[in-house]
C-alpha cells in the first residue's frame, strides 16, 4: 500500500492486476497505487533490486524460478477475475479476411484442445523454459484453454469491473466486441 508497483507497461496485465489487488485489499486507488514501468520480466529482475519498484505482479509459474532461486519471493497470489488471454481482431481485418481469421481460430482451438495430449509436452516445456518438471506439470494441470468465444455475460462482467476500477470510462456495446 502506497508503494510503487513495477509494471511492464500501462494497460498490461501487470498494470490491470495491480488495480485488482488494490481493490481486493481495500486501498484507495488514487492515493495508494503508484507505478514504475520496467517493461519486462528482465526489466523487473534488473530494476527492482535497484529500488525501481517495490513489488510486481506476474504469472506465478513464469516467475517461480526467480522465487525458488532468488532474487524474488512470493508474498501472495491474486487470481485474475477474467480470462487471461483473448484473441482480438480489428473490424477491418475481420471484414476483409474473415476466412483467414476463422482458419487461424480453428488451428488455435485444435492445437490447444490437443496440447496436453502431446507426448512428453511437460518435458519439452520444462527444457525449453528451464522450469522444474513438477512446476510444468502443475501448470498443465491448472491451465485450460477455452474452445468457445466469450459469452456476453463474461464480457459484460469484465467491462463492469474495468469501469468500476476506472480503467475505462464506459462499457462498449457488446455487438462491437463479440462477432
Question: For each of these PLM feature ranges, what is it?
Answer:
Residues 1-65, 123, 152, 156-157:
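Bilobed "Venus flytrap"/periplasmic-binding protein-like clamshell domains
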Residues 23, 28-30, 72, 130-132, ...:
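Short coil/loop linkers at secondary-structure junctions
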Residues 35-36, 40-125:
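Pocket-lining segment of extracytoplasmic ligand-binding domains
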Residues 165-179:
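C-terminal solvent-exposed extensions
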Residues 6, 74-75, 144-146:
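A ubiquitous short alpha-helical element
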Residues 61, 80, 139, 175-176:
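Residue-level "edge-of-site" marker
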Residues 31, 57, 76, 135, ...:
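A generic structural-conservation signal
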Residues 95-169:
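Secondary-structure end/capping motifs
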Amino acid at each position: 500500500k502506497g508503494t510503487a508497483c513495477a509494471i511492464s507497461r500501462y494497460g498490461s496485465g501487470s498494470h490491470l492486476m495491480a488495480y485488482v489487488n488494490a481493490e481486493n485489499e481495500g486501498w484507495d486507488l488514487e492515493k495508494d497505487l503508484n507505478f514504475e514501468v520496467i517493461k519486462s520480466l528482465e526489466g523487473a529482475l534488473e530494476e527492482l533490486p535497484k529500488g525501481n519498484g517495490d513489488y510486481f505482479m506476474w504469472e506465478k509459474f513464469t516467475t517461480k524460478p526467480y522465487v525458488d532461486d532468488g532474487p524474488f519471493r512470493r508474498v501472495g497470489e491474486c487470481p485474475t477475475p477474467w480470462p487471461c488471454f483473448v484473441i482480438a481482431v480489428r473490424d477491418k481485418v475481420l471484414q476483409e479476411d474473415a476466412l483467414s481469421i476463422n482458419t487461424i481460430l480453428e488451428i488455435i482451438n485444435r492445437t490447444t484442445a490437443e496440447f496436453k495430449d502431446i507426448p512428453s509436452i511437460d518435458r519439452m516445456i520444462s527444457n525449453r523454459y528451464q522450469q522444474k518438471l513438477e512446476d510444468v506439470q502443475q501448470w498443465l494441470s491448472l491451465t485450460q484453454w477455452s474452445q468457445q468465444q466469450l459469452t456476453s455475460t463474461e464480457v459484460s462482467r469484465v467491462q463492469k469491473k474495468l469501469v468500476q476500477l476506472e480503467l475505462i470510462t464506459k462499457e462498449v456495446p457488446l455487438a462491437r466486441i463479440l462477432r
